[in-house]
Swiss-Prot record:
Native organism taxonomy: Bacteria, Pseudomonadati, Pseudomonadota, Betaproteobacteria, Nitrosomonadales
Positions of the catalytic residues: 49 (proton acceptor), 60 (proton acceptor)
Annotated GO CC locations: cytosol
Protein name as catalogued: Tryptophan synthase alpha chain
Enzyme Commission no: 4.2.1.20
Amino acid sequence: MSRISTLFGKLLQNRRKALIPFITAGDPEPGMMVPLMHELVQAGADVIELGVPFSDPMADGPTIQRSSERALKHRVSLQDVLAMVGEFRESDSSTPVVLMGYANPVEAMGYDAFTARSKACGVDGVLIVDYPPEESVKWVEYLKRQNIAPIFLLSPTTPQQRVERVASLAEGYVYYVSLKGVTGSLHLDLHDVAEKLDGLRSRISIPIGVGFGIRDGATARAVAELADAVVVGSRIIEEIERSPKAEVLTNVHRLVKSLRIAIDAASPAPSAAVKLTHL
């Protein structure tokens, strides 16, 4: 059983929801990444989404775009990101790590080399933003050969045919983008999220994480009432961006801990569609 499946199985048994923070590899600087990853875990993160820096992050808002730019100034490459995961694995063999990024760096390395290296370094899942599921069969085959979960995005405007395709390809969890637009958007409509998740659960048998627009504990708690996982990215990146270097770890820990506490205060009722048999 994969680390992701094991994690969600334990969470379901304990009637808890996952906290999935996103950070960009190399921001604020490469040498801080592994300590920052460990700090996230100590603060209560269940899964770490690690962004691969890219020069044209079309799905990301200004905050994460700036984060990617800072990492690229340090010349952080995909190889460097994988090395960071490998170093993290030297002292953490249980926390799932999911890479999130764009197709260009992966294709430059090649599917075979990328998936083999990812497996060797301890990557558990990969989400490529600009790979539509309809064109991802070959990509998914390479991932599954290495027991790496292919993770896909769904949104409020995803057509049913695409939902069905994602349901047939995805493993680990599905990332539901709760807002139209780019990362960092505001005005989360929880009623709409609840309705959309109800519809998705009749088709998606793996856990569903919700992200975009989650900026505080109250919203994180409300989303945890509806979803299997809460994904927080832009708010954490903002904390990194505005913190003096010496205070980054402390400030991020404080923020993530507050989100953890809020999520754990949510209703313990497990999400309707996720069963241990699906994990």
